[in-house]
Regions:
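Extended acidic/polar, glycine-enriched regions
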Residues: 2-26
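Blade-edge motifs of beta-propeller repeat domains
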Residues: 20-68, 100-122, 159-183, 215, ...
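Beta-propeller blade termini
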Residues: 69-80, 123-134, 162, 176-177, ...
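Acidic/hydrophobic-patterned starts of short beta strands in beta-sheet-rich repeat architectures
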Residues: 80-90, 134-143, 195-204, 256-265, ...
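Hydrophobic or amphipathic alpha-helical targeting/insertion segments
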Residues: 129-163, 189-191, 195, 199
Length: 447
């Protein structure tokens, strides 16, 4: 290996292998440990096939693709035989799959082949098994997500399939979340919000199609007891409207008053907690609202065995080109910068001089906003341009500005009421974005 320290800037450094020194790690004290998990093979083998759609061809300035966030997996006893089956969502052009458990084996469900074929034209972003019509079996909510469809497409309506008790499904023929909202759904959760004995729904909008940076809305759908849902967001939770780009949510009785409260997270969002006051959800103003991240997942469990459930929230992580803090946040400026009727989101970082610079390179910006080519004819003219050099201050003042001040996957320990304390966790949890979290006593040590 070759070690160089305190290297000066503006120079070419030449390394030669013959000048390197021998170096090896000392593993003498390392003890072999028995793996906690072993690889297993479930047959039949289900392979997820992603569509060829490329988000960047439509929106040049986004930092990741929202059309390929699947597949999602969940489990539930679909056919009433007291064994948990596996459900796997699908990309556009493919059908969702159910693996029916039979003892130690699985077989691919064939009963619902025709009705699942009707779902091929949607990007199935989530499958929620729950008893919608109170008949004792699990029905299936299929959410339609991604950005591949037109905002006018009927395929953006979510679908509710009702179970006949034998694992055979029929379409409820409901337009969900309602007839006026064709959305790209990111998450759906069930819970008895109004304590009337049936399961109601929260549906979260992942993204405004073609308008990355515009906040989406959450929807509260109330069950009439027979599996018919009505959108009552305006009456029950108006503050869910335009709340953000929602990725996950959870119902939990945080204050132990017998009512399910709601937690909602997403991109450029704080951790939003809504107290269920019986007839209305009211947003809680606490420190978690200031924890603005690129949140992907929320998991609730009692980590310290104090009888109170804590929060584990999956974020982007700290192992990428992006950095964010409260003193130097990532900012997204959203506006129709070129006045063509379509908005653009410009993602920026704050430099040491306090100015915001776009992450996008000159050619990416010009691909999205053609008028900038005249202003910046070459890379030399662009290399020191901050956001105020690129766009007039007037249009920046009119822009929606969203920020991110933490990229850490985080644990928040429940205190009293709606208060939580953030604790440090191992650095390994920050090596990649976290999209799914589970908790269990995997090592059989009692916690």
């Amino acid at each position: 290996k070759t070690f160089l320290k305190n290297i000066g800037v503006n120079q070419t450094v030449t390394l030669n292998e013959k000048d390197a020194i021998e170096y090896s790690e000392d593993f003498s004290s390392t003890k072999a440990t028995k793996p906690l998990f072993q690889k297993t093979q479930i047959k039949p083998n289900v392979i997820h096939k992603e569509s060829n759609f490329v988000d960047f061809n439509r929106e040049r300035l986004i930092y990741h693709m929202c059309s390929s966030e699947g597949p999602k997996m969940t489990k539930g006893d679909i056919n009433g035989d007291n064994e948990e089956d596996i459900l796997i969502s699908s990309s556009k052009g493919n059908t969702p799959q159910i693996l029916i458990k039979n003892g130690s084996d699985y077989f691919l469900d064939q009963k619902n082949k025709d009705i699942f074929n009707d779902l091929k034209n949607i990007e199935n972003s989530e499958i929620l098994p729950f008893d919608a019509d109170n008949d004792g079996d699990l029905d299936l909510y299929f959410s339609s997500g991604s950005v591949e469809h037109s905002i006018y497409s009927q395929t953006l309506y979510d679908r509710l399939l009702l179970n006949n008790g034998k694992g055979e499904f029929i379409d409820s023929n409901q337009t969900l979340p309602d007839i006026n909202n064709k959305i790209s759904t990111g998450v759906v959760k069930s819970g008895d919000i109004d304590n009337d004995g049936d399961q109601d729904l929260f549906v979260g909008e992942r993204i405004k199609i073609g308008s990355y940076g515009l906040p989406g809305s959450g929807f509260i759908l109330i069950n009439d007891g027979s599996g018919n849902f009505s959108n009552q967001t305006k009456e029950i939770a108006p503050s869910l409207t335009n709340i953000g780009m929602i990725t996950d949510a959870a119902f939990e009785d945080i204050d132990s008053d017998g009512n399910l409260d709601l937690i909602v997270v997403g991109e450029y969002m704080g951790i939003n907690i809504f107290k269920n006051e019986g007839s209305k959800f009211v947003r809680i103003e606490n420190k978690l609202l200031d924890e603005k991240g690129w949140w992907n997942e929320i998991h609730i469990t009692d980590l310290n065995n104090d009888g109170k459930n804590d929060l584990i929230v999956g974020n982007h992580g700290l192992n990428s080109r992006f950095n964010a803090s409260k003193s130097k946040p990532i900012r997204l400026y959203y506006n129709d910068f070129d006045k063509n009727g379509f908005g653009e989101g410009i993602i920026c970082f704050e430099a040491e001089n306090g100015k915001d610079y776009p992450y996008a390179l000159r050619h990416d910006l010009i691909d999205q906003i053609k008028s900038l080519k005249k202003k910046f004819p070459d890379y030399e003219s662009f290399k020191t341009a901050d956001i105020t050099n690129i766009f007039d201050q007037k249009i920046l003042n009119q822009s929606d500005i969203h920020s991110v001040n933490t990229l850490e996957t985080s644990i928040y320990i429940k205190k009293e009421g709606f208060e939580f304390e953030k604790i440090s966790i191992p650095k390994e949890t920050q090596f990649s974005p976290v999209y799914s979290i589970n908790s269990h006593d995997f090592d059989n040590d009692g916690d």
